Amino acid sequence: MALLQISEPGMAPAPHQRRLAVGIDLGTTNSLVAAVRNSIPEALPDDAGRVLLPSVVRYLDKGGRRIGHAAKEEAAIDPRNTIVSVKRFMGRGKAEVEGAANAPYEFVDAPGMVQIRTVDGVKSPVEVSAEILATLRQRAEDTLGDDLVGAVITVPAYFDDAQRQATKDAARLAGLNVLRLLNEPTAAAIAYGLDNGAEGLYAVYDLGGGTFDLSILKLTKGVFEVLAAGGDSALGGDDFDHLLFEHVLAQAGLEVAALAPEDVRLLLDRVRGAKEALSAAPQARVDVKLSTGEKLAQTITRDTFAALVEPLVQRTLGPTRKALRDAQVSAADIKGVVLVGGATRMPVIRDAVAKYFGQPPLVNLDPDQVVALGAAIQADLLAGNRSGGDDWLLLDVIPLSLGVETMGGLVEKIIPRNSTIPVARAQEFTTFKDGQTAMAIHVVQGERELVSDCRSLARFELRGIPPMTAGAARIRVTYQVDADGLLSVFAREQHSGVEASVVVKPSYGLGDDDIARMLEDSFKTAEVDMRARALREAQVEAQRLVEATEAALVADGDLLDASERATVDALVASLRALAPGDDADAIDTATKALAEGTDEFAARRMDKSIKRALAGRKLDEI
């Protein structure tokens, strides 16, 4: 009889039965796809042997399009219909797109995510990204010889909910099943850690075309634990290009507004080429013939470029310091620094990293490929292609705290930043007024104490709360962040069981510097925030006590004589007058005075309630 072949759950029993899954690095400048083949992760090339696909899409009339290298080569002749660096637009509104005024595109004034008008119609960043992803999917299926079961797609660690959701939407549009959204620095650590069997504390310095991430990871016996993450969602190699572009224009006495769109794109391409050349040579030339016939020729030295971009280099060190502080480690504790992203090839970056951490960075893996390789390893695991040596665990984190608005515009943090995901946390709240039958749940993101200083993510209402006295209802609010970093919120009234929930999908994501600014502001203004919170709490308590006292006077004012009533009225009036002010101590003092001044009144009301409850009842009935 035939023998039954038994394999561990989740493990493919034979190599020919491996489920095909890939890792995709959807980058600002370039994108690529990788897969595990013969137990080794490798980037998959196109027919010409190129692994990098320029993240460029050119739209033609009658539904035609060019993607990748062909589109990049034609960008200068048709800049309005050739979309580059689309990742910068993902999950963002027009007002949040840095440099939108100088871009050659015709932006459509529409609510939500920014859209671009082309000869083939209006396109969203999700649609453009889907074209790139579909091209990579086709490359993978052609190379691997079968359909894919799914893909792990990498995103910057500092991408917010909207940007992550936009990425998933693009993948679905491209016909990809998303197994996981994986933070780019974490993917790099997986590739590096598994490749080298590394253990200890590592920093991943990820400077891509449009984003910067810095993550601190602890690698221990197959466990990849992200201790802290920092970054800037609007800082990348493109910004270095634009600084050099502006310098070249200034040296030539030109202004960008005076250039034709095709000249802007052509000059940007030449400037980018010069920047890349400076990584290997002490100087580089920028030679351009503009559409006007004017020739522009300049020599850029490495020292000139380094001085020019020094402010941008320093911008990367701010989040680096914060991440180290959050992880409660110092630069000296870091065993190695992994560089990710093509922009880290710049000597000025490598020198700055080496100086800050006191050691040369690790560059034995291609910074353009390392993220995709790590994603491929994770995809292979999630597809069920585990082998005996694949017992490793990934523990990632959320970059910013998630909270809920409470009475007085205060923020109650439910999940603090750098919490390991997936995670679910719950907290109980109650009603503020007697007979309250509904509660508005306002979900916010940020590190500040007041709602007005944080980013609003979503709002929903819990209705059907049974009428009770203030403080009697128990509403349990649960925040749940999945492995992709996406948030769902649930609210349930414990007595009645009524429920409400929302999957957080903001119309578009955080602004250019919102996330970094939120963290920076929280450190700079911590003392001010705490004072503001104390004032708001005092005001809320004062309002509650005034309303409760006035309600009691209406119901049982006859329990006080004229003199006592006058005293209580005076205390109420004093507190009502102070409550809107900004003197928390004075409000607290007046609140305490009213509370103490109504102690006797409260006791009489209690006696009256007890007598009413016992009236007409015999002793043996009690």
UniProtKB/Swiss-Prot annotation:
Belongs to the heat shock protein 70 family. Keywords: ATP-binding, Chaperone, Nucleotide-binding. Pfam families: HSP70. InterPro entries: ATPase_NBD, Heat_shock_70_CS, HSP70_C_sf, HSP70_peptide-bd_sf, Hsp_70_fam, ISC_FeS_clus_asmbl_HscA. SUPFAM superfamilies: Actin-like ATPase domain, Heat shock protein 70kD (HSP70), C-terminal subdomain, Heat shock protein 70kD (HSP70), peptide-binding domain. Chaperone involved in the maturation of iron-sulfur cluster-containing proteins. Has a low intrinsic ATPase activity which is markedly stimulated by HscB. GO terms for biological process: iron-sulfur cluster assembly. It comes from the Bacteria. One of its GO terms (molecular function) is ATP-dependent protein folding chaperone. It comes from Burkholderia mallei (strain ATCC 23344). This is Chaperone protein HscA homolog. HAMAP family: HscA.
